[in-house]
Amino acid sequence: MNTFGDNFRVTTWGESHGKALGAVIDGCPANLPILEEDIQNELNRRRPGYSIFSTPRKEEDMLEILSGIFEGKTTGTPISGLVFNKGQKSKDYSKIKDTPRPGHADLNYFLKYGNYDYRGGGRSSGRTTIGNVIGGAVAKKLIEFTHNIKIIGYSTKIGKINGDFDYYKNPEFFESDSNIEKLFEKTENNPLRCPSKNSDEMKDYVLDAMDKKDSVGGIIEIIIKGIPQGVGNPVFNKLEGKLGSAFIGINAVKGFEIGRGFESSDLYGSEMNDEYYIDENSINEKTNNAGGIIGGISTGSPVVLRVSIKPTPSISKIQDSVNLISNENEKIEIGGRHDPIIVPRVIPVLESMAAITVADLMISGGYINPCRL
């Protein structure tokens, strides 16, 4: 499937070395103020060349809106946007077209379909997340305009090095919108999008991996602030279930947790439970160990999510593989231009999928008028 969502639907299309990539967004209400540059700004955060740790593939990723936005507002009709590929070098892959790359979807695609686009992974490439970000930019605008919901992501771990900043070290920090704006500026000016004081140590770790012709992964934390109580449904349409599906749909993602996550298995119930109190006739939580979701439904506290990102599978080391034509063992050495770490570029993609998920559930739950704003 290439479509995500039930009421706010995003269909992505395109391949890494194809002519273009893009998205069609269906279900966005009319009259949402949005400019092409709002979407372009999100694409700029994802595109190659973000930092010294990004692939040297040169792509401007300039957006073209084909429909659905007129005179600075959505019309209520499908929004279609695309980005043309201009910097692809398909010849880099011609020598290994019959030799699947370890860690990539090449072999699985070939075994399932009997055919696959070997040029940069085709549809399984991280470049296809351009469509996710186009859809996510619209969703971000929608939930912020209607409910002042803000979504921010940042690295908390790079390789084996843990950072010193995350939600649970200072939850009060996230109560202020101005703090979130400052955090965004800080992370965007860091090549690893990491606000931790020891980010220089992390940079050295990645540089060392590059020298060894290797790659590294990491952990990203995503915070959704301002989501009202009641978003999501019990059992099979849970908020965390939808978010998990959205995140796991990104190829680099290998793990997902909510709130205290796996750490909660170490805690007593008395430590994990979020106790309640009344303040100015409002029921509040003393803590947010559940991460803003209980019973599949948002509590009104910030939603706290963490995602594990695997090391970039394209590395320059010689690896063992097979030849699909001769059916013999074969060594493979991957050329081309690749990220030694994909973590910082995945952050805007995760933010986008979180926004799409929230927008979809808020429309279905009656928080946002599906017709017009």
From Swiss-Prot:
The keyword Acyltransferase does not apply. NADP(+) binds at residue 46. GO terms for molecular function: chorismate synthase activity; FMN binding. It comes from the Archaea. The keyword Transmembrane does not apply. Belongs to the chorismate synthase family. Its cofactor is FMNH2. Pathway: Metabolic intermediate biosynthesis; chorismate biosynthesis; chorismate from D-erythrose 4-phosphate and phosphoenolpyruvate: step 7/7. It catalyses: 5-O-(1-carboxyvinyl)-3-phosphoshikimate = chorismate + phosphate. It comes from Methanococcus maripaludis (strain DSM 14266 / JCM 13030 / NBRC 101832 / S2 / LL). InterPro entries: Chorismate_synth, Chorismate_synth_AroC_sf, Chorismate_synthase_CS. This is Chorismate synthase. GO terms for biological process: amino acid biosynthetic process; aromatic amino acid family biosynthetic process; chorismate biosynthetic process. HAMAP family: Chorismate_synth. GO terms for cellular component: cytosol. SUPFAM superfamilies: Chorismate synthase, AroC. Reduced FMN (FMNH(2)). Keywords: Amino-acid biosynthesis, Aromatic amino acid biosynthesis, FAD, Flavoprotein, FMN, Lyase, NADP. FMN binds at residues 123-125, 251-252, 295, 310-314, 337. This reaction introduces a second double bond into the aromatic ring system. Its EC number is 4.2.3.5.
